[in-house]
From Swiss-Prot:
Cytoplasm among keywords: yes
Full protein name: Dynein axonemal assembly factor 10
Keywords of the record: Apoptosis, Cytoplasm, Repeat, WD repeat
WD repeat copies, ranges: 63-105, 115-154, 162-205, 207-249, 257-297, 319-357
The organism's taxonomic lineage, starting at the top: Eukaryota, Metazoa, Chordata, Craniata, Vertebrata
Length: 357
């Protein structure tokens, strides 16, 4: 691919914020997005922005008692577009951004900070009930149904006497029918655990040697296809989730991408083979996954095992001197993307020529 044909990553709008921003998410079916974080005075903040004529207009600012670490629209309907958030005190709240004074759902989900959140079953993505998963420093991963008060529908925690590991990232997947659904969780010691929610079992686990910062399936609402895991020390791994070997697990390929921590991975909603990683040195890398000629082969005993593909770098850009801590593609407009970084900036990016890859 020549330099002229390659996608370009263009910083379209930059906005400096007056607080530390931890997460940003597009509001579905709109040119709006939310940013979440904490003010220096120790309170939490949610801001709603809209893109208007090449600039950002602040539509709403909501201040809450506790700093807000993460949020998702993944379990809401397209009509309501409620935002679910996790905060520093372990609370899970669901907000109607039109009337945000009181949450529409509230539960003290964890004993410590909720580091990570994901949703499925809303927005027309994933079969089955809407659910939210949260992961916390208290070592537990909990699945919540917004229609059920107080208690999680599933609770994955270490057994008595086992060390509690800090859970840094969670992701839903495999939600291709009413029954099937998995949650993948990544921990500070490099553990990755795949929980099967249908029969409430640990389906697979592995360790990638470095703390797992971000996990994402290429699609939540299909039979598991690929999983990307990013980590400290600048590495990420792509697992082929189609074929699970009884002892070797899933085949994977790893890539040393950034000079420092890879904070985030996000797959392009319009093409699941393309994904963006965000690094600790303020850089973004755009990748494409290439499948092998055959995705599975038989081992010496005739048991099916997966074959990993390869990853190629399409483009990279440095936006900031500080880590890019969150990243979100627009579900509606191909190539439109937002990211936030620890220099208290939110950026709207345009990635060009994505239809040509």
């Amino acid at each position: 691919m020549s330099a002229f044909e390659k996608p370009q990553i263009i910083s379209h709008i930059q906005k400096s914020l007056s607080y530390t921003v931890f997460d940003c998410k597009w509001m579905p079916c709109s040119a709006k997005f939310v940013t979440m974080g904490n003010f220096a005075r120790g309170t939490g903040v949610i801001q709603l922005y809209e893109i208007q004529q090449g600039d950002l207009k602040l539509l709403r600012e909501i201040e809450k008692a506790k700093p807000i670490k993460c949020g998702t629209f993944g379990a809401t309907s397209l009509q309501q577009r409620y935002l679910a958030t996790g905060d520093f005190a372990g609370n899970l709240h669901i907000w109607n951004l039109e009337a945000p004074e009181v949450p529409v759902y509230s539960v003290k989900g964890h004993k410590e900070i909720i580091n990570t959140i994901d949703g499925v079953g809303g927005l027309g993505i994933g079969e089955g009930a809407p659910e939210i998963v949260t992961g916390s420093r208290d070592g537990t991963v909990k699945v919540w149904d917004p229609r059920q008060k107080d208690d999680p529908v599933a609770n994955m925690e270490p057994v008595q006497g086992e060390n509690k590991r800090d859970c840094w990232t969670v992701a839903f997947g495999n939600a291709y029918n009413q029954e099937e659904r998995v949650v993948c969780a990544g921990y500070d010691n490099g553990d990755i655990k795949l929980f099967d929610l249908r029969n409430m079992s640990l389906r697979w686990e592995t360790n990638i040697k470095n703390g797992v910062c971000s996990l994402e399936f290429d699609r939540k609402d299909i039979s598991m296809n690929k999983l990307v895991a990013t980590s400290l020390e600048g590495k990420f791994h792509v697992f082929d989730m189609r074929t699970q070997h009884p002892t070797k697990g899933f085949a994977s390929v790893s890539e040393k991408a950034h000079k420092s921590t890879v904070w985030q991975v996000r797959h392009l909603p319009q093409n699941r083979e393309v994904f963006l990683t965000a690094g600790g040195a303020g850089s973004l890398h755009l990748w494409k996954y290439e499948y092998p000629i055959q995705r599975s082969k038989k081992d010496s005993e005739g048991v099916e095992m997966g074959v990993a593909g390869s990853v190629s770098l399409l483009q990279n850009v440095t936006l900031s001197t500080q880590p890019v801590s969150s990243l979100d593609w627009s579900p509606d407009k191909r190539g439109l993307c937002i990211c936030s970084s620890f220099d208290q900036m939110v950026r709207v990016l345009i990635v060009t020529k994505l239809h040509k890859i």
